[in-house]
Regions:
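Acidic, Gly/Pro-rich loop/turn segments at junctions of secondary structure
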Residues: 1-82
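Paired acidic/hydrophobic, glycine-rich loop segments that form the ligand-binding mouth/hinge
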Residues: 5-9, 97-101, 117-118
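Short beta-strand->loop
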Residues: 20-23, 77, 112-124
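Alpha-helical segments flanking ligand/cofactor-binding loops in enzyme cores
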Residues: 21, 47, 89-90, 144
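Alpha-helix/helix-capping structural signal
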Residues: 34-35, 86, 104-105
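Conserved, function-defining micro-sites of small-solute handling proteins
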Residues: 76-82, 86-87, 92-94
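A ligand-binding cleft/hinge motif common to bilobed small-molecule-binding domains
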Residues: 89-114
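C-terminal effector-binding regulatory domain of bacterial HTH transcription factors
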Residues: 103-108, 112, 122-163
Length: 163
């Protein structure tokens, strides 16, 4: 365990020696390139994901989708796995399959038409962004000032909407 002052992380810290403050929530989207969907066909229901190639981040081995009337859980079984979201995005742009990505990584790619949303009527489980820091009694005033600053940082809040 290395010493640190503060960290940004997705998901609530599980370590009881850490204090966590949620900054906000970032939506994720299911996306593919227009070329991929022309070649492989569009989807009308998440059940059809088994007929498609998935590009999956190791931390998101389960895709939880929700429509107005139904919840659906998809477990990609023969997915192209990665631990790099930028790589997953670039694979999707290149037509390698369907992926889930956070809003901050895809906004410009969707605007330019490099990626399109798959099953837009279905919501994908998003991510919470947390500020984590040790629960030491004597955290420095500089650290506490930084934490207060980070909690107000508008560029982060542009993608992570408070709950």
């Amino acid at each position: 365990f290395r010493s640190f002052d503060v960290a940004l992380r997705t998901g609530k810290p599980q370590d009881s020696s850490l204090i966590g403050r949620m900054i906000g929530h970032c939506p994720r989207y299911m996306l593919a390139s227009p070329d991929y969907l022309v070649r492989r066909g569009s989807l009308t229901h998440p059940r059809q994901l088994v007929e498609h190639r998935s590009i999956t981040h190791r931390a998101w081995s389960e895709w939880l989708l929700r429509s107005e009337s139904e919840d659906y859980r998809y477990l990609p079984d023969n997915a192209h796995m990665t631990d790099n979201l930028v790589y997953a995005r670039e694979c999707a742009i290149a037509g390698a399959g369907i992926t889930l990505l956070p809003a901050f990584l895809v906004e410009d790619k969707v605007e330019k038409g490099a990626l399109v949303q798959v099953l837009p009527e279905w919501n994908v489980e998003g991510n919470d962004l947390w500020l984590a820091y040790p629960s030491r009694k004597l955290n420095s005033p500089a650290l506490m000032s930084y934490i207060e600053f980070a909690m107000q940082f508008d560029e982060v809040k542009r993608y992570y909407v408070g709950k």
